[in-house]
């Protein structure tokens, strides 16, 4: 396929540095998308329509099982701005927009520096702004959906640019319409609603303990952000040093009957009642009870400080990760009758 300048296109591109697991893989073509015009130029190419495509953000939610025989679109769209202040039934809020290629953590810290709290519990989550709604991230008592306003995305099939609100994003637990239609949509920019009537969310046990240890009884948003950063750095490996994709499995959500069966044998199991009557379980606890915490299988392993994180001990490939994930799933299911679902996308 002939692509004319100014597109930043690379052939036989190395994807190793572009995924936080550090898995070896190459792409037939890599396009660095720095604006909507780059996507439109690519869509105008006659050979584009029929080939495989992969939209890539920070590569922190990805397991590459081998080379990719198509075009990888590496989203690097920058920009941050205050759109304005909106008054609605929920009160006044700052509407803040960021380009999809912005580093998520840097964006969070920037909003706090501007005096716009609301995203502090989501500090230090790896990845980009554009990937955050795709994965529907959440941590330490706050879900992205609580702060999400809208996003703009381009349909790679039709070339149409469309805006999505909470309803049309069809958010689910660590899920969205974009994740279910992988390769179709490229997120361009995301807008967030940050309430001016801010209140801290510090009820999560780890956050409360960290704040107490710091002697902070009335935390501000920056205090919560600092606490979350400290917790994550203690518990989770730095991808720059140890390859990983963060939390590898979703916390399973079961019905009351399934929880009753588990509680009869393991009343100590961590559990979190949901509004709809279901029960969210701690995948890390299930994995640890199955004996996997700190164990290795070939060049990959289960992190010794957090069983929910799978790590590349050095020289691993995507199939090694898939093999370990399957072994953990099988053991947890055999012991508890619960099937764990991976968070990362396998390609």
Curated annotation (Swiss-Prot):
- Pathway, per UniProt? Cell wall biogenesis; peptidoglycan biosynthesis
Signal sequence, start to end: none
Among its keywords, does the record have NADP? Answer: yes
What broad class of enzyme is this?
oxidoreductase
Biological process (GO) annotations? cell division; cell wall organization; peptidoglycan biosynthetic process; regulation of cell shape
GO molecular-function term, one example from the UniProt record: FAD binding
The active site annotation covers 174, 247 (proton donor), 343
Tell me what this protein is called: UDP-N-acetylenolpyruvoylglucosamine reductase
């Amino acid at each position: 396929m002939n692509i004319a300048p100014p597109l930043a296109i690379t052939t036989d591109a190395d994807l190793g540095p572009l995924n936080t697991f550090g898995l070896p893989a190459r792409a037939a073509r890599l396009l660095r998308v720095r604006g909507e015009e780059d996507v439109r130029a690519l869509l105008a190419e006659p050979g584009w329509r029929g080939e495989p495509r992969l939209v890539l953000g920070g590569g922190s939610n990805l397991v590459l099982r081998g080379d990719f025989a198509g075009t990888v679109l590496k989203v690097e769209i920058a920009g941050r701005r205050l759109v304005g202040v909106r008054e609605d039934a929920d009160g006044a809020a700052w509407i803040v927009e960021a380009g999809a290629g912005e580093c998520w953590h840097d964006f969070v810290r920037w909003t706090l520096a501007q005096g716009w709290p609301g995203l502090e519990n989501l500090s230090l989550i790896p990845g980009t702004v554009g990937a955050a709604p795709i994965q529907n991230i959440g941590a330490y008592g706050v879900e992205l959906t609580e702060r999400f306003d809208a996003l703009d995305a381009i349909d790679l099939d039709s070339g149409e640019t469309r805006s999505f609100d909470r309803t049309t994003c069809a958010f689910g637990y660590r899920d969205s319409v974009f994740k279910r239609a992988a390769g179709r949509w490229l997120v361009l920019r995301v807008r967030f609603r940050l309430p001016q009537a801010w209140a801290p969310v510090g009820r999560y046990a780890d956050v409360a303990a960290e704040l107490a240890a710091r002697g902070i009884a009335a935390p501000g948003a920056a205090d919560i952000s600092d606490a979350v950063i400290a917790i994550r750095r203690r518990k989770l490996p730095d991808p720059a040093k140890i390859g990983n994709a963060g939390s590898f499995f979703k916390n399973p959500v079961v019905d009351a009957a399934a929880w009753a069966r588990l509680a009869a044998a393991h009343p100590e199991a961590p559990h979190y009642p949901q509004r709809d009557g279901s029960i969210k379980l701690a995948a890390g606890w299930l994995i640890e009870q199955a004996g996997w915490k700190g164990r290795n299988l070939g060049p990959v392993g289960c992190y010794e400080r957090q069983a929910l994180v799978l790590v590349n001990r050095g020289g691993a490939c995507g199939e090694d990760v898939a093999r370990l994930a399957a072994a953990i799933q099988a053991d947890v299911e055999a012991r508890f009758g619960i099937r764990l679902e991976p968070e990362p996308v396998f390609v």
